[in-house]
Amino acid sequence: MLPDQALPIYNLLEKLLKETHKSINDCYKNENLYKHQLAKIYCQQAQICTPNGSTKLSKNSIGLYENAANLGSEEANIKLGKIEFKSGNYVKALEYFKNLCKRSF
């Protein structure tokens, strides 16, 4: 194959690679958006499960906050960190607070 004949093929390959890269980036952004929205929903459900004016969270609320924290929610990590700190579980509290630095979205 002559170099002049290969040029259109290379141009087509370049175009396909760019489109594939853009598609992968779009999927990554959509996945992060989905995780962020799901974490928000978990936090909202946890607030609903907490009796009005109560400072103590139910096991159900804590479970929902843990789900949100696993998705990278700042609100959930702060809430769980405060709970563990007040309970005297300083190592666990520190883990939740460290997760704030590893934000995924």
From Swiss-Prot:
Name of protein: Uncharacterized protein RC0040
Organism encoding this protein: Rickettsia conorii (strain ATCC VR-613 / Malish 7)
